Amino acid sequence: MSRRKKRVTGEQALRLEFESVDHQPLIDALGVDIPRELLVLALTHRSFANENGMLPNNERLEFLGDSVLGLSVAGQLYQQYTSSPESDISKMRASIVSRYGLADIAREINLGQHILLGKGEQLHDGRSKDSILADTTEALLGAIYLAHGFEIARDTVLRLFKHKIDTASATGLHQDWKTTLQERLAERNLEMPTYTSTVTGPEHEQTFTAEVAVHGTVLGTGVGTNKKLAEQAAAHKAVGFLQDNPAFV
């Protein structure tokens, strides 16, 4: 007589999926501990929750994290850019906390591999979707706030977003061409860009040249006094290329 295989409950599926990945590198990247229960919740996308018996998902934490993020960035911009009018710092904040800005940070800390997704989202490369990466980043910030309070959550935000905040007024009004390029590529369902750079000249007067490519095709080349500026210039050129070549896929 064959034995009927026991069905895995939603809670069991959640535990198995969560424990299949080592989350310590994520905790290290965030720079702050998160209690296991909150970490599990923050990483549980609604697709996984719905496929496994309507488990709790991270949307409420996302709501909380959005507020923590917005206030933290707004406060820092207010203090750091004392001569900028409200209209300018408002635009800076909007760009920094946008879906694409958040997804940028998520990729820097390799968040995608830690997210608990349903089978459908996994098949559609959900771990690389800007929307899922951004929402999960906010959920993690919400979890940090609940575990440690606003001050620690704010410090985490300012550490993760330091470069974006520090460069927000590089061109008067914030224009992050790398983020804009990611947005344009996502609209066409294209893979994220790759950057390569070279440096020439003496150490005290170096010139950096960067290329940005998609599918092995170079879309733009930029020059700058450091690597970041060169990559921004290359991304700017790539955005122009996409505007001039709407059929590029």
UniProtKB/Swiss-Prot annotation:
Which residues act catalytically here? D66, E138
Oligomeric and partner information: Homodimer.
Under SUPFAM superfamilies, the record lists: dsRNA-binding domain-like, RNase III domain-like
Q: Report which reactions are catalysed by this protein.
A: Endonucleolytic cleavage to 5'-phosphomonoester
Q: Which PANTHER family match?
A: RIBONUCLEASE 3, RIBONUCLEASE III
Under CDD domains, the record lists: DSRM_RNAse_III_family (cd10845), RIBOc (cd00593)
Q: Name one GO cellular component term.
A: cytoplasm
What is this protein identified as? Ribonuclease 3
Q: Where is the RNase III domain?
A: 21-149
Domain DRBM: where? Answer: 176-244
What is the E.C. number?
3.1.26.3
| An example molecular function term from Gene Ontology annotations | double-stranded RNA binding
This chain's source organism reads: Corynebacterium diphtheriae (strain ATCC 700971 / NCTC 13129 / Biotype gravis)
Q: Can you supply a Gene Ontology BP term from the record?
A: tRNA processing
Offer one Pfam family short name for this entry.
Answer: dsrm
